[in-house]
From Swiss-Prot:
The keyword Cell division does not apply. Belongs to the intron maturase 2 family. MatK subfamily. Usually encoded in the trnK tRNA gene intron. Probably assists in splicing its own and other chloroplast group II introns. The keyword tRNA processing applies. One of its GO terms (biological process) is RNA splicing. PANTHER family: MATURASE K. GO terms for cellular component: chloroplast. Keywords: Chloroplast, mRNA processing, Plastid, RNA-binding, tRNA processing. It is found in: Plastid, Chloroplast. Coiled coil: none annotated. It comes from Lemna aequinoctialis (Lesser duckweed). This is Maturase K.
Length: 512
């Protein structure tokens, strides 16, 4: 592991020919499957025609696999049946999948906190990992969005030409053989489809090697955001403060004054269209939200920037309708499974001066997060917990499990959902979800025991509902014992947790 240290230094991973030699190291493939460096890798085994290496990953084996992939006479395509549109002969799909696993491990080396912690001989997870909670975004939105005017709902487009992806990686990977190998891996999964789109070919690519797919997609998104960040920093002349000549303290204020006079006299009319110190941007997966306190014209300018960026930098046309510009408080947007809005609340206060009395109107804005019941029911229906009308149904696939396992699965699903949606300002939808999952569990158990739901619930009694008791209710009961808040007041307050590192699968359907 010591030889990785040179690659983890700043700029060390940009050296030429560091990737391709690492593909021939046995421990790379052990790391790919979290195996010990001296333990046989059991996740994949070699085909019979190349056995005899004790099922270990060796440099000789990898060389033979890459050689077979490069041989053009092994590439046989089917032009009549798309389901057979893959490599055939000598198990080439296995070879390329194995190589792609090693490739994924190599490119993740500079970004792997697990590897960095192991190099430092520390077993604990770095502390900054605790700051990666999904819920940590919402306190930021609560603090910033109440003062903003416009919001843009942006869907980052998927179609990216394969060669563009290679060029993006080429900015920091200067290893030509590795880039050629990456092209071969692309063409195996796509076979003539030169774009990453949410279709069957991409589904096969992401399913067979999700680590490599996530890395490539994140590289593309980082490239988009880096250009956006450059435009954002260049949108205001105040960024000139960071230039080298202005670092001299003796001339700093004089030059700042000169810059201010020059911009006000000569360039003020043009720069005022781009300067926006109140621009805020958040993103999760392929959806991003950009909010501003500027004008509608400024938001349209940014929309034009994004469309031109995707068209001229990544060479594909994106519909302008993928960017929706709306104005608070008349707009609600979906983000991370929540329906968020900034409504205006009116409050009246009666004031009296001498013999005259009058009402004073006060306008306040508050960031609210709610659960939309219709998309949530659709997500539960897709998972076969209810129908599209929201009526609970049994889960036949779980009928063969034991009673305790069935109850535990349903209870765990609800506890995860209630934990994730603890930030909702209105908890009524959680009660509806609780009803659907609880009755679906009862129908599944009744189906297993060939009984009616009513008879089965009477036999179980109140113990059946203990698995669906909210963990948040236990926490809130402890808080109520020490505070003066009522249960009704506290139930409306959002609770954000800093231990949620991934979005729930049922919630994730809402953002698709």
């Amino acid at each position: 592991m010591e030889e990785f240290k040179g690659y983890l230094q700043k700029g060390g991973f940009k050296q030429q020919h560091f990737l391709y030699p690492l593909l021939f190291q046995e421990y790379i493939y052990a790391l790919a499957h979290d195996q010990g460096l001296n333990v046989n890798a059991s996740t994949f085994t070699e085909p019979p025609e190349i056995s005899g290496y004790h099922n270990k990953y060796s440099s000789l084996l990898v060389k033979r696999l890459i050689k077979r992939i490069y041989q053009q006479n092994r590439f046989i395509y089917s032009v009549t049946n798309s389901k057979q549109n893959r490599f055939v002969g000598h198990n080439n799909h296995f070879y390329s999948q194995m190589i792609s696993e090693g490739f994924s491990s190599v490119v993740e080396i500079p970004f792997s906190p697990r590897l960095v912690s192991s190099l430092k001989k520390k077993k604990e997870i770095p502390k900054y990992q605790n700051l990666r909670s999904i819920h940590s975004l919402f306190p930021f939105l609560e603090d910033k969005f109440t003062h903003l005017t416009y919001v843009s709902d942006i869907l980052i487009p998927y179609p990216v030409h394969l060669e563009i992806l290679v060029q993006i990686l080429q900015c920091w990977i200067q290893d030509v053989p590795t880039l050629h190998l990456l092209r071969l891996l692309f063409h195996e999964y796509h076979n003539g489809n030169n774009s990453i789109t949410p279709n069957k070919s991409t589904y096969g690519f992401s399913k067979d090697n999700p680590r490599l797919y996530r890395f490539l997609y994140n590289s593309y998104v980082v490239e988009c955001e880096s250009i956006f960040l450059f435009l954002r920093k260049s949108s205001s002349y105040l960024r000139s403060r960071s230039f080298g000549p202005l670092l001299e303290r003796t001339q700093f204020y004089g030059k700042m004054k000169h810059i201010g006079v020059t911009c006000c006299n000569d360039f003020h009319k043009s720069l005022c269209l781009f300067k926006d110190p109140f621009m805020h941007y958040v993103r999760y997966q392929g959806k991003s939200i950009m909010a501003s306190k500027g004008t509608d014209f400024l938001m349209k300018k940014w929309k034009s920037y994004f469309v031109n960026l995707w068209q001229y930098r990544f060479h594909f046309w994106s519909e302008p309708s993928r960017i929706h510009i709306n104005q608070f408080p008349h707009f609600s947007f979906y983000f991370l499974g929540y329906l968020s809005s900034v409504p205006i609340n009116l409050s009246y206060a009666k004031s009296q001066m001498l013999e005259n009395s009058f009402l004073i109107e006060t306008f306040t804005q508050k960031f609210e997060t709610m659960i939309s019941i219709i998309p949530m029911i659709g997500s539960l229906a897709k998972a076969k917990f209810c129908n599209l009308s929201g009526n609970p149904i049994s889960k036949p696939a779980w009928a063969d499990l034991s009673d305790s396992d069935i109850i535990d699965r349903f209870g765990r699903i609800y506890r995860n959902l209630s934990h994730y949606y603890s930030g909702s300002s209105k908890k009524q939808t959680l009660y509806r979800i609780k009803y659907i999952l609880r009755l679906s569990c009862a129908r599944t158990l009744a189906r297993k025991h060939k009984s009616t739901v009513r008879a089965f619930l009477q036999r179980l009694g109140s113990e059946f509902f203990e698995e669906f008791f909210m963990e948040e209710e236990k926490v809130l009961s402890l808080i109520l014992a020490r505070t003066s808040y009522s249960s009704h007041q506290l139930s409306r307050e959002p609770v954000w947790y800093l231990d949620i590192v991934r979005i729930n699968d049922l919630v994730n359907h809402l953002d698709l």
